[in-house]
């Protein structure tokens, strides 16, 4: 499909699960915009600029992926970039209810904005940035969960 889609998140940090969703989306769609969100209600491990850079470096081999930092409403960002579809990763039942509510709210706010749910590959189903941060804060090894560039930035 020659369609522009958006995959949004805080990506603090980007994980191999995120990267799996980005890679698979890039095979399905003409252009994938990875929208790195500034979320004032969270205390990030990395600044917005650092997260954008880490995602860019993690995705550099994907020619149809663009990484952009943003703040504000995702529906407004989607309109600015002429995207009519959002990609959301869902790990399991715990994510589904929240993600459906979010998709319905986004559609209510933006009309034609659709959401496509992609589960991660089985080996990343349990993985989240929150878990990676917790392991890291307790001096655990996160090397198997994040791209190499993230691991280097954490050291």
Swiss-Prot record:
It is an enzyme of class 2 (transferase). Its EC number is 2.7.7.3. GO terms for molecular function: ATP binding; pantetheine-phosphate adenylyltransferase activity. Substrate binds at residues 10, 42, 74, 88. The keyword Protein biosynthesis does not apply. GO terms for cellular component: cytoplasm. Belongs to the bacterial CoaD family. It catalyses: (R)-4'-phosphopantetheine + ATP + H(+) = 3'-dephospho-CoA + diphosphate. This is Phosphopantetheine adenylyltransferase. Pathway: Cofactor biosynthesis; coenzyme A biosynthesis; CoA from (R)-pantothenate: step 4/5. It comes from Glaesserella parasuis serovar 5 (strain SH0165).
């Amino acid at each position: 499909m020659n369609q522009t889609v958006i995959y949004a998140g805080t990506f603090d940090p980007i994980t191999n699960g995120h990267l799996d969703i980005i890679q698979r989306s890039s095979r399905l769609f003409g252009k994938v915009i990875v929208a790195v969100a500034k979320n004032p209600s969270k205390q990030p491990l990395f600044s917005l600029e650092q997260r954008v850079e880490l995602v860019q470096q993690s995705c550099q081999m994907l020619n149809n992926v663009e990484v952009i930092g943003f703040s504000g409403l995702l529906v407004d960002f989607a309109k600015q970039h002429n995207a009519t579809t959002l990609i959301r990763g869902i790990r399991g039942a715990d994510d589904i209810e929240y993600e459906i509510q979010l998709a319905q709210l986004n559609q209510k706010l933006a009309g034609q904005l659709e959401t496509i749910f992609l589960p991660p590959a089985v080996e990343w189903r349990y993985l989240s940035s929150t878990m990676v941060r917790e392991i890291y804060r307790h001096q655990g090894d996160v090397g198997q969960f994040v791209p190499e560039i993230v691991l280097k930035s954490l050291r």
